[in-house]
Amino acid sequence: MLRQATKAPIQKYLQRTQLLRRSTPRIYTIVQCKRSICSFNARPRVANKLLSDIKTNALNEVAISTCALKSSYGLPNFKRTYVQMRMDPNQQPEKPALEQFGTNLTKLARDGKLDPVIGRDEEIARAIQILSRRTKNNPCLIGRAGVGKTALIDGLAQRIVAGEVPDSLKDKDLVALDLGSLIAGAKYRGEFEERLKKVLEEIDKANGKVIVFIDEVHMLLGLGKTDGSMDASNILKPKLARGLRCISATTLDEFKIIEKDPALSRRFQPILLNEPSVSDTISILRGLKERYEVHHGVRITDTALVSAAVLSNRYITDRFLPDKAIDLVDEACAVLRLQHESKPDEIQKLDRAIMKIQIELESLKKETDPVSVERREALEKDLEMKNDELNRLTKIWDAERAEIESIKNAKANLEQARIELEKCQREGDYTKASELRYSRIPDLEKKVALSEKSKDGDKVNLLHDSVTSDDISKVVAKMTGIPTETVMKGDKDRLLYMENSLKERVVGQDEAIAAISDAVRLQRAGLTSEKRPIASFMFLGPTGTGKTELTKALAEFLFDDESNVIRFDMSEFQEKHTVSRLIGAPPGYVLSESGGQLTEAVRRKPYAVVLFDEFEKAHPDVSKLLLQVLDEGKLTDSLGHHVDFRNTIIVMTSNIGQDILLNDTKLGDDGKIDTATKNKVIEAMKRSYPPEFINRIDDILVFNRLSKKVLRSIVDIRIAEIQDRLAEKRMKIDLTDEAKDWLTDKGYDQLYGARPLNRLIHRQILNSMATFLLKGQIRNGETVRVVVKDTKLVVLPNHEEGEVVEEEAEK
């Protein structure tokens, strides 16, 4: 009776608690559980008896609530068995913090999983000196992204494994700490700090055997910072000052973040890593060559490595060596590898031809007429021949793929044997080392050499297995849009006769066309200066003589699209405050984060024609801004980006000296300007711009005035343009010679050049054509005739207006 009387109140209380749990938020549930546990503490014997009778699922819920209460209210634990019941019996023991949140680089070096590191001997020696200090033994690697900061750490790990370090660093473990995984999944306040302290405790227990590497060390500032807690940097500061060996890495810009905390920055000893030279990069690529050959199953020629270093340094300007050169080699190898995994072009062509024949045979199967039967027999013979050829090429392709795979496996085995040799030498297993050095490795080297020699024989090769300089050039061209490939025969002919292509659009300006053509040929031949733009020109002359049109024609020749000109109308930059729009507004101003119009356009199109139209209308500060562009081929925008102009053609047009050309020139039949007048125009320009600006322009070209003979050629060009527009309607336009002469006479204006002719054609021909098209007097597929009647230019209709109305009524 006493037992039931004692048990009943507690059961009622638990039932009420369950009801409250279902109807109230979680916080009230925790409070009710707390009260229940307090009542258990008041009567321990009754509580123990009650708990022994509760089912397993109830025990589990109490255990969970107990764990939550312990963390929130500091209550003592129940029996450990209750908590353990919730645990998975198959759960693995927790990993050590260093293994969980870090990567052991020395272990990777022992297994041969790190790439070889070439050079950087001085920087590695400096890092070893700092690590050997008693306090503040924390080197900080500072350098641009891609110069090899992380690779230097890999090199240090390899030296530790090889024993090429002082005794104080031998047998040490170099562990790369992952700050991302350290903070990922930290749900409760203080959990991140607890993880970090566990890592530091394990490092302390190692008694100096562990060296920590932290990449992107600027992330320590503010990492894990919440209300009332410390960030990671404040937790690490005491350890860094008392002997914790920590190597860090960051960029020049991000090191400024660390410098804002003097207490943290003084604990690191900076080591500056400069970008390696082109020759050093070539040495690095030669050291990595074998790893990439084994991975991709291809061969890499030495000329490809040299081209990767040279071309990346020349054309990829927003990144740094050796990273960008390694990327070129890697991508070129990947392209070749994908070609190996897909069918060659010859086999694909045969597949398509066989499919076409099979479809045609299927359609002729039921035909019995002699012509169809004869055609079917011819197709069957052709199909048999093509199938035989396909089988032959497929066998060759399969054999070549197997041969390439065999070479790849042999190289992989050779590399693994060399790794085992180094391991045996470190461990003192000289018997196995002798077997590897004098037996297995020479056999594998001989096998690789014989396989490559047989692959280079005179037999037919469907697969190209060597990465050459041409492959590197193609990758550069795809990445940057700059044509760096070897000039093909068709392109050679096109470049040699470039003047003829430009003269199809611009006539009467032979000197300017020749100067631009020479500049483009120099660039494609690889003979331009590496420190300046391809060319810079100032086009002078009266309005309407073809200055802007020649620039558009150049863009069409280079890019097959005249809209590929980066054009700036300098009338928009007349005021001083508008000049900043070219490179971006200063910090604090509107649109200061969007960059400049000029710099952003060239960053996205590094190979382009940049046109500054009507340059004399711009503010004088614009010419000062272009001094560095014309001389050094680069410009820095408001965001600090260094924009490369070395692959651009700079063209400035101006009407300076127009009055001299109109008044002082004796115009001949060809419209050419004499030397004395040209000198006067150039002198007028020199008075308008400072000498340092004039001296940086490659060539000042004075455009000839348009004579009537030249204007007659322009009439033909404009009529051809109209014909191109009418091609969609299957229409043609036909002008008599008399009509063309009429346009030449009426459209000629010594002051305004060719623009009056354009307006005349628009007014006299296009307006009438538009009216007749709408009325149906000229229809699609017909020829538009233009003649001269009674000294007037007339477009002749092909149908009467009334006839069109009747047809429309019938419809």
Curated annotation (Swiss-Prot):
SMART domains, from UniProt? AAA, ClpB_D2-small
| Transit peptide start and end | 1-44
Chain coiled-coil ranges: 345-430
InterPro entries on file: AAA+_ATPase, ATPase_AAA_core, Clp_ATPase_C, ClpA/B, ClpA/B_CS1, ClpA/B_CS2, ClpA/ClpB_AAA_lid, ClpA_ClpB
Q: Which GO terms describe its cellular component?
A: cytoplasm; mitochondrial matrix; mitochondrion
Report residues binding ATP 1. Answer: G143, R144, A145, G146, V147, G148, K149, T150
Keyword list (alphabetical) reads: ATP-binding, Chaperone, Coiled coil, Mitochondrion, Nucleotide-binding, Repeat, Stress response, Transit peptide
Q: Give the chief site where it resides.
A: mitochondrion
| Name of a matching Pfam family | AAA_2
Q: Where in the cell is it found?
A: Mitochondrion matrix
Does the record's keyword annotation contain DNA repair? no
NBD1: region residues = 98-344
- The answer, when asked if Transit peptide is one of the entry's keywords, is yes
As one GO molecular function, the record gives: misfolded protein binding
Q: Give the region (NBD2) as residue ranges.
A: 467-658
Name the positions where ATP 2 binds.
G541, P542, T543, G544, T545, G546, K547, T548
**Induction description:** By heat stress. Expressed at a higher level in respiring cells than in fermenting cells (at protein level).
Name the SUPFAM superfamilies for this protein. P-loop containing nucleoside triphosphate hydrolases
GO biological process, any: mitochondrial genome maintenance
Q: How does it assemble?
A: Homohexamer, forming a ring with a central pore. The hexamer is stabilized by high protein concentrations and by ADP or ATP. Oligomerization influences ATP hydrolysis activity.
State the domain notes.
Has 2 AAA ATPase type nucleotide-binding domains (NBDs) per monomer. NBD1 is primarily responsible for ATP hydrolysis. NBD2 is crucial for oligomerization.
Give the free-text miscellaneous remark of the entry.
Answer: Present with 2990 molecules/cell in log phase SD medium.
- Role noted for this protein: Required, in concert with mitochondrial Hsp70 (SSC1), for the dissociation, resolubilization and refolding of aggregates of damaged proteins in the mitochondrial matrix after heat stress. May extract proteins from aggregates by unfolding and threading them in an ATP-dependent process through the axial channel of the protein hexamer, after which they can be refolded by the Hsp70 chaperone system. Required for resumption of mitochondrial respiratory function, DNA synthesis and morphology after heat stress.
- Tell me the PANTHER family matching this sequence: ATP-DEPENDENT CLP PROTEASE (PTHR11638), HEAT SHOCK PROTEIN 78, MITOCHONDRIAL (PTHR11638:SF176)
Protein name (record): Heat shock protein 78, mitochondrial
The record lists the lineage as:
Eukaryota, Fungi, Dikarya, Ascomycota, Saccharomycotina
State the gene name recorded for this protein: HSP78
